[in-house]
């Protein structure tokens, strides 16, 4: 049973790794950093329409990155739980 669980965890790990690529997490992180820098600039909020557009873009990027990071965290938790379960007598 433990071998099947480990295999399942490794399959999920591969899917999460694949998601990193097709979701372009590194690019989205760089884009978010650039947008956050724009948002932090003095006068950014003077143009309400532009500010709203940039804020929505940043929010969308943040949502995608946060969802990916949540999946990574769950994967780490699953691996840790599997390791702990293997230590029990």
Report residues per predicted region.
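Charged, heptad-repeat coiled-coil alpha-helices that serve as long linker/dimerization "arms"
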Residues: 1-89
């Amino acid at each position: 049973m433990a071998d099947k669980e480990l295999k399942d965890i490794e399959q999920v790990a591969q899917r999460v790794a694949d998601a990193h690529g097709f979701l372009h997490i590194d690019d989205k992180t760089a884009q978010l950093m650039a947008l956050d820098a724009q948002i932090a600039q003095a006068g950014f909020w003077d143009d309400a329409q532009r500010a709203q557009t940039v804020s929505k873009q940043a929010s969308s990027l943040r949502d995608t990155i946060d969802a990916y990071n949540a999946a990574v965290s769950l994967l780490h938790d699953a691996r840790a739980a599997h390791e702990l379960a293997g230590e029990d007598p």
